[in-house]
Every structure is written in structure tokens, then in C-alpha cells.
Amino acid sequence: LDEMAFSAASTAVKDVPVRAFNVFFGLGIPAPLQKEGYEGVLEPLKPLRDKLLIMRNVDQVRCDVSGINAHFDGATGSFTAMPAGGEAKAGGPSIDQVVRQAHHPGGLSPGMVPTLIGGTYFRRSRVGRYLHSYNLDGTVAGTMQEKPRDLFDRVFGVVNAGTDGDARKQRLKRSVLDSVVDQYKFYTGANSPLGSASKTRVAEHLERIREYELRAFEMKHRNSEGPKLPPRSKVLHGGQADPGGQGIDITLEELTTEWHLMADLYALSVQMDRVRFGSITFLAAGERIRLVGDYEYDGRKIFEFNDPKQLNASGDQGCSHEWWHKFSEKKKNEQLRAHAHMKMREVAYFLNRLDSDKEANGKSILENSMITISTESGDGRHNDSKRELSGVFHAITGANSRFKTGEIMDVGAEGLDVYNTMVGAMGAKH
């Protein structure tokens, strides 16, 4: 653990914000496959290898709760390293919230979202399957935003209606750009106190907002009265997304289109400094989907997903979840490998969005933030809880030179000790 963090916290440059985000992906990566490093299912993370510390052999066995499997206890233990405190409560705080409380005990600046929680997922029988930010007392740190338009409104587009205390809300203006036109003109005009580089950056930020408004709300420039209300999400939500645990049919294109918009909007919120803490989920713990579609990576076809056909089953038995139940070190595990590889591609999609902009210290938001990637288990067979909760995959970013990236480390330690090392390096403790 001593090798994870640089010895002197003073190595971190102080002129960028402290940020902490948790990135969760469902079902996990079996520990034996993690040993293959970037030559296996972790390949999509390879272009970012210099900015990541991959941690193998992280032990989350203390999170075991009798009578339930890792889809519940391991999922709630991700980023908390504690057994679940109930069906809708963690056994302690998540690491992002420990860091938030340490650096902002009185709250963040007005106008900022204290904690942003979003994701693309379908299983929802317990909150811990999909929500991964918890307060110091283990309660959820915010409301999950599972639709792109809801996440956009959470960050940019809703204000309280009056001061009469009722719960009604109204939209500030459907277009964020309409609400900042005067400021934009001033800060990019002749009397602006900004330099040319800063003016350019302001313009680029607003152009990026316009791009996401168009995508999230189907805005049409010809509509003089503003954009249309956003359409319903093209994927299922609520009870329809988890019909009795039987799973849903979905194409790879439908899944990734929804996720990319969600990931883009979340990254935009961070880039605009509206959000510094929170979590994002790509597929819930124990996710049940029947995925169909050609999967390509780096210009080559990796696999053709067709879960129900390849499993020769329908309902829950025809879902990709079953490949984790069927995992064996003695088999090729072709289908599981393809699914896990795809999940790493989509995690990398989000990370790359945060690696595009440089901050004042010359590093990207990705490099300056503490972004922790994890999942619920290191084995999906459910017949050995110790094996199931051992070897849980973790990766972290450098957090502004606080952690040593560019390595794959066999940690061989409890998740609780790993997390305490991390938050300690961030100037926090719990």
C-alpha cells in the first residue's frame, strides 16, 4: 500500500480543484482474467495506461453479508469497503464523500451540484446494485439520474419556483446558452478582463453545451421559441427495465448510444466545474440484459453478441449474466471475455472525455481527479463467497500526482486499507 501513493502530499499542485468520482461497471472481471493485463479484456484501457494504476488482488471479503451474494453485498461494498447497512443503505461512506466532506465541510459553492450520480443500467432490485455514492452515515448521497435529460436538468436547467416553500419546480430556460448570452458577450468582447486563450476556452465550453443540448433535447435551430421538450429515453427505465429480474432485450447500439450521451453530459458537468464529486454507473451489479449486435474495437470485429441464441435460452437464463455463472479457468470463456472487453471500452469512453481538456497545471481533468473504477466481485459463480469477494478489480487515476500511475500492482490487501490509503493521500480520513 505504501507504494500506491507518493510519499509527500506536497507533490500535488494546489491550483486545481480536488475532485473524486467513482466509476462502477456491473458483473466484474474474474480474477484469473485480470492477470492477463492489457493483453486481455483490459485492452481498451491500454491507451490510458500511463494515467491509471491498475490494482489486482483487492480483498472485499469483509463486505460479505450472510444470505446474499456479491451482486448485493459486493456492489454496496464497492467504494465503501463495508458490509451493506440495509437494502437501501451502505455500511459506511463512499470514498468520494469522505474526500468531499474533508475539503468542503461547509458545502460547495452556490450553484454547484454537491454530488452528481448518474448511469445507464437496468437491474434495480436493491439500490446498492446501481448507486455508488454514500454519505458518512451510509445513506445515499444523492438521487440517481438515469435519463440524460434528467442529468442535464440536475446540473444546468432547474430552479426552485419562488420562496413559498412548495415543491413545484420550473425550468430556468430550456437552453442554458440563452441564460448566459449577456455574460458571454462581455467575457468575449473588447472590454473583457480575459486573455485570448481564456476567451477561446469560454467559447469552446459554450459550443460544447450547445452540442449536448442538441443531442439531449433534440433542439432545432429553426424553433424560435426554444427547444422541444426532450423525448423519452430510447431505453427502458423503472419497472419495465427490470421485469421480475427476467432481463430485457437490447442491442449494443441502443446501449452504447444511451451511455455515450450520459457519459458526455456527466463529463461536461465536470468540465464546467459544476460537479466535483459523485459516481457514474455502466450497467448494474448482476445486470440482466440479452445483448445483440456486432462488437468492434480499434477497427476490428471482436465478437458478435447474441446472448439468447448462444445460451439457447430465454428470460433470465438467456442473459449475459449467465456467462459469469459459467466461467471456468479451464475454458476459453469467449462470451464473457467479449462482454468484459466491451465494458472496459465503455469505461474508457468516459475517461477519455475527461482527458481532453488541460487545466492550469498542464494536466487533464482525468489526471488531476481521483477517479476510482471498480465492480462487485472477482468471481461470478456464487459458490464460494471468499473467492467471489477476493481479487476485485480496481483502478485509480493519479489525483494530481498523489498516486503512482502507469503500473499494474498486485496489492494483496483489504479494500478498507486500500481506500484509507487513498483518502489519506487526498488529505482526508475516516
Residue ranges and their predicted role:
Residues 1-430:
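Ligand-binding pockets and gating/stacking loops
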